[in-house]
C-alpha cells in the first residue's frame, strides 16, 4: 500500500508537469490547428537558461535565499522562452499559415532539431546538475514522501489551469482567442487582430513550457539539451488523450498519463515476471496514445468536429 501511495504521488507530480506542457500544445492547436513539435525544446531552453542564471546569481549574490534566486531565474527564463517562441512563430510558422498542413508540421520538427543543436553548441552536450534551491527535507504522507519541489509543482499546475480558464473565459484577450479559433477572417472583420492573438498564444505557451522545464529540472536534478524531447512528446500524448484544443482536457490527460506511467513503473516488474524493468515505462504513454487514437480520436473531453480545410 505504501508503494502504491508513493507511486500515486509521483504520478500526480509527473502528470502535473505533463499538464503544464500540454496546455501550451492545446492552446496553439486550438487557435491555428498547428502541432508545435518545437514546444518541448522551448521547455529545454527555459530550463537551461534558468540553470545559467542560477549559477551567475549564486556567484554574484552568495547570501541570497534560494527561493529568491529560483524566482528571479524563472522570470528571466520565461522572458527568454517567450521571445524565442514569438520569433519562431513569426519566422517559421506565420509564412506557412495558408500552406498544406504537412508544411508547418515538417517545419516544427525541423525547428525542434535546430533548437536542440543550438542548445548543444551553447550549453555543451553534457548533463548539468540542477541546484536544489528549496528546502530538501521531505514531508511524510502515510508511508510515502513528498518534497517541497513536488508540492510546488502541484500548486503551480492548479494556478496555471485556473489562470488559463480565467484568461480564455473572462478577458478581452480570451474572447479574441475564441473568435480567432472559430474563424480568423470573421474575427478580423469584428476588430480582432489575429496576428496579435496568435503571437500572444505562443508567448503564453512558452511561459508555461519554461516553468514546466524549470520544475522538471528541479524535480530530477539535471538539465541537458535533449531533455525536452521526450516530455514534449508525452505531453502531446496527454493533450490528445484529454482532447487537444480543450484546456481541461490537457490537464486531465496529463494527470492520467502521469498516474498510468508512475503506477506502471512501480509494478511493471511484477506484471511481466521480471522481464521488464522500470526503465521500460515510456511504453505506457504510447500504448495509451494508440488506444485513444483507435477508440476515441477526439480524446476524453474533446468534441468530434469536422476537419478544417
Language-model regions: role of each:
Residues 18, 70-78, 202-209, 215-286:
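Transmembrane alpha-helical segments in multi-pass inner-membrane proteins
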Residues 31-87, 91, 267-275:
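Membrane-embedded helix boundary and interhelical linker motif in transport proteins
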Residues 14, 145-223, 242, 247-253:
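Helix-loop-helix "hairpin" substructures at the membrane interface of multi-pass membrane proteins
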Residues 1-21, 49, 60-72, 99-103, ...:
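Membrane-interfacial amphipathic/re-entrant helices at transmembrane-helix boundaries
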Residues 61-111, 118, 252-257, 261, ...:
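Alpha-helical transmembrane segments within multi-pass membrane transporters and channels
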Residues 95-96, 101-170, 197, 263-282, ...:
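Transmembrane helix-bundle core of multi-pass membrane transporters
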Residues 4-54, 87-103, 239-247:
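Single transmembrane alpha-helix segments in multi-pass membrane proteins
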Residues 47-52, 77-84, 111-119, 156-165, ...:
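Hydrophobic core segments of alpha-helical transmembrane domains in multi-pass membrane transport
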Amino acid at each position: 500500500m505504501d508503494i502504491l501511495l508513493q507511486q500515486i504521488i509521483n504520478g500526480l507530480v509527473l502528470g502535473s508537469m505533463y499538464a503544464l506542457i500540454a496546455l501550451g500544445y492545446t492552446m496553439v492547436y486550438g487557435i491555428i490547428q498547428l502541432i508545435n513539435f518545437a514546444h518541448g525544446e522551448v521547455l529545454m531552453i527555459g530550463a537551461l537558461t534558468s540553470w545559467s542564471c542560477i549559477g551567475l546569481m549564486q556567484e554574484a549574490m552568495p547570501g541570497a535565499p534560494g527561493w529568491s534566486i529560483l524566482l528571479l531565474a524563472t522570470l528571466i527564463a520565461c522572458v527568454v522562452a517567450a521571445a524565442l517562441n514569438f520569433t519562431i512563430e513569426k519566422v517559421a510558422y506565420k509564412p506557412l499559415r495558408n500552406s498544406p498542413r504537412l508544411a508547418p508540421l515538417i517545419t516544427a520538427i525541423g525547428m525542434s532539431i535546430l533548437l536542440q543543436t543550438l542548445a548543444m553548441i551553447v550549453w555543451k552536450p553534457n548533463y548539468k546538475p540542477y541546484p536544489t534551491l528549496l528546502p530538501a527535507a521531505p514531508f511524510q504522507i502515510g508511508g510515502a514522501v513528498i518534497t517541497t519541489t513536488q508540492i510546488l509543482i502541484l500548486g503551480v499546475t492548479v494556478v496555471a489551469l485556473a489562470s488559463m480558464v480565467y484568461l480564455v473565459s473572462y478577458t478581452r484577450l480570451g474572447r479574441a482567442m475564441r473568435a480567432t479559433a472559430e474563424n480568423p477572417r470573421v474575427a478580423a472583420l469584428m476588430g480582432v487582430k489575429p496576428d496579435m492573438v496568435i503571437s500572444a498564444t505562443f508567448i503564453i505557451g512558452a511561459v508555461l513550457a519554461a516553468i514546466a522545464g524549470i520544475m522538471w529540472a528541479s524535480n530530477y536534478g539535471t538539465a541537458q539539451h535533449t531533455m525536452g524531447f521526450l516530455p514534449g512528446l508525452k505531453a502531446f500524448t496527454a493533450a490528445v488523450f484529454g482532447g487537444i484544443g480543450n484546456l481541461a482536457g490537457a490537464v486531465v490527460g496529463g494527470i492520467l498519463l502521469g498516474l498510468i506511467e508512475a503506477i506502471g513503473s512501480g509494478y511493471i516488474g511484477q506484471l511481466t515476471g521480471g522481464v521488464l524493468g522500470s526503465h521500460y515505462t515510456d511504453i505506457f504513454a504510447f500504448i495509451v496514445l494508440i488506444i485513444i487514437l483507435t477508440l476515441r480520436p477526439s480524446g476524453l473531453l474533446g468534441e468530434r468536429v469536422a476537419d478544417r480545410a
